[in-house]
A protein has these predicted regions:
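Sec-dependent N-terminal signal peptides
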Residues: 4-13
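OB-fold and OB-like single-stranded nucleic-acid-recognition modules
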Residues: 18-166
């Protein structure tokens, strides 16, 4: 009797999971009422990326002082959001598909010309493959990630990056 009761209880909990799914109702057009709407990416500017301050912080693992970022409110609101950003492509390692997008051409970038760390963004591509040349001016779309703690990455990262065709 106890076994029968347990089986009946299990069936009553599991059975609803196997009911057929009814498709969502249609509107007068062809779109579904519950159709997801893709978020339009925010057109990010280098000016907005300047909403950050830096202070020197000691990193014992590398025995060096480095600049630690404190992101302003306007940039914090964009963390994890879809963005588009235009800049100059700087190849870091072609074989690893490692690229940086810079506010400035190579001769004036953060690495060579003395611009600040807020003027470069790491591109983490959704799909590897396309090769870019130094100083190609391109627009990329992806998810903005703010990085304050990983000293082996840049402060700004565009994850799942894709080039926007123009």
């Amino acid at each position: 009797m106890n076994r029968l009761l347990i089986v009946l209880l299990l069936v009553s909990f599991i059975a609803p999971a196997f009911r057929p799914v009814t498709p969502p109702a249609k509107t007068s057009g062809s779109a579904s009422v519950l159709a997801p709407v893709a978020a339009e990416p925010v057109k990010l500017s280098w000016e907005v990326l300047r909403d950050v301050t830096f202070k020197k912080k000691w990193y014992a693992e590398e025995s060096v002082y480095m600049l630690y970022p404190t992101f302003g409110q306007s940039i914090q609101k964009l963390n994890g959001k879809a963005v588009e950003l235009t800049g100059y492509v700087l190849p870091v390692d072609l074989e690893s598909n490692l690229y940086v997008l810079s506010a400035f051409p190579y001769s004036a970038c953060f690495f060579c010309g003395g611009a600040g760390p807020e003027s470069v963004v790491s591109l983490k591509f959704k799909k590897a493959g396309k090769k870019f040349k130094t100083d190609e001016r391109r627009t990329f779309r992806g998810t903005l990630k703010l990085n304050a703690d990983n000293i082996y990455e840049l402060n700004y990262i565009i994850a799942d990056a894709e080039m926007v065709e123009q």
